[in-house]
Amino acid sequence: MLRISSSLLLASLLVAVTSASASENYSPYADVDHPTNVYWGDTHVHSSWSPDAGGSGNEKLTPIDAFRFAKGEPIVAHNGQTVRLRRPLDFLLVSDHSEYLGLYPMLEEGYPALLATETGQRWKQLVEEGRRSRVGGEFAASLSSGRDLVGDRSFVPHVWKQVVANAERMNEPGIFTAFIGYEWTSMPGTANLHRNVLFRDGADLTRELVPFSAVESQDPEALWAFLADYEARTGGRVLAIPHNSNMSAGRMFETTRFDGSPQTPDYAERRMRFERVVEATQIKGDSEATTATSPDDEFADFENWDAYAGMGVIGPHEDWMYGGEYVRPALGRGLELRQALGVNPFAFGLIGSTDAHTSLATADDVDFWGKFSSNEPYAGRDQDPFAQLEMPEDATFDFSVAARELPDQLYTASLVSSGYAAVWAHENTRASLFDAMARRETYATTGPRMVVRFFGGWGYEAEDATRPDLARVGYEGGVPMGGELGAGPEGLSPRFLISALRDPEGANLDRAQIVKQWLDPESSAVLERIYDVAVSDGRTIDGDGRARKVVGSSVDVKRARYTNTIGEDALITWWADPDFDAATPAVYYVRVLEIPTPRWTTYDAVKFETKRPQNVPASVQQRAYTSPIWYTPGG
């Protein structure tokens, strides 16, 4: 009989335990490699270095001031009051216009090449006369034609080096990310085709480039070519972020190329290489959805800006334009184009940002500082034009002080206190945040900082929504927002996990919805349906997936207050598509709605004891839009 001593047995057991411990960590978090933090920021803020900002009252707040404000430091605004964010942001892109970048500092400095031009001399004289608004007006008017007003713009590379130096100075990896970039301001015939250019890289790669502007070309393909050349030369990475599609006169998401020719697979691939996310909400209106294309959506038409075609009042808006202006119909068009081209040119994620030209990234109804510094808080600001520019006589459009008979859309009351970009990233660095945007793990909010998760997969179960480690379950069993699902097990429909937590300093939540679009299997037309997947206050979701009972309102308009006596702190749920067809491409995204809260104009009316404007709502339901998840048969 074989005998084993007790000491030998104990030793062998210790070895076994040690071996097991070495191969399997005790800590359940040791191997976690998915993003656990959401970072908040703004990829669209202008300083006094942008000609239109400097021409509309922002004479002194520089890019450095913009970064300081985003970091939570107090700043003295042009009206002499101190302003400070309720909570700091995690990242910022100061996206001053590349067209005549740093014009006013260069005029004040007396940059020789600029003052050697006739226009430069005239502009310097206007600035000395206190007529910056005229210079800003000429800049704004020139954008519709792309005409070069100066001829010699050699001052731009000089200013760009300062732009890069400013971002490098304010960048604090792990604490605050200062992105390097600018805005490319294409506006043919006043159709807004603007893109914000955001670099992953630092000064070592970006310092020597000369920003591409719409003076060189108004065609987005020319911008992409410039960005492709940058990446090829440097090994760096860069994104172009479209914004204000709602003011593009149907051109931002048109089904043709800029020159009117048909889209090609190569075009779609180049677009998706650089345009990974779209700015879906900002001060000049929300671009998520319109009842013109989604007539059954009672929550569409939120703060829309589409009364006229393009940026200027050059003509009435036409119905055909809507499909190329709003995010939701664009996502549907993307499904159609993928069928035709094999590539989806509109497979973009979503973010929000402000487009503030004040250097102040404010997206808060109770502390709204306007689009331009001329809109800084004062009694009756809602009754004044939002852009107080002196337009040239030959301008093709006018939203100036002189044009007092303006449509409602061009008065300050119509401005929207929106929005911010939420990014699920591993850490607060340029590289990590950029990579998250590139993989579309982002969402847009109209200002509140609600925390939203969205996962899609084939194996989630209803009880997964109750798991404390919902995010880990989501990543291990599927894809996050911005991801793509291929064919699943036969007979199964995709399942989704949705988690929405209210802003801890904001309003309760009304509901979480899934918006689905798919191609009709017979006609290939885009179909759409909205499902209420989680609602507050014990309301019932009917058999068609909709909750008909509204959440109500706790808003006291006379005092500009609300209470969290309705709604929920959190909405967390599991949902399986009840109408799924495995043969049909589809796209899904989540929309989260808060309970009603006072609009900024209501707060202003109470603070300044003025009459509240009647052409805008007294209260609004702030919201979040996630990046979509796509399903592709056989993908």
What are these regions (language model features)?
Residues 1-4:
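Positively charged n-region of N-terminal signal peptides that target proteins for export
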Residues 7-17:
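Bacterial N-terminal signal peptides
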Residues 22-63, 67-70, 77-116, 152, ...:
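C-terminal functional module detector
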Residues 113-147:
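Aromatic- and acidic-residue-enriched carbohydrate-binding clefts of CAZyme catalytic domains
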Residues 124-125, 131-135, 161-165, 177-179:
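Mid-domain alpha/beta scaffold segments of enzyme catalytic cores
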Residues 198-200:
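Long, charge-dense tracts
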Residues 203, 213-218, 300:
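Conserved, charged catalytic cores of large soluble enzymes
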Residues 211, 222:
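Acidic, metal/ion-coordinating pockets
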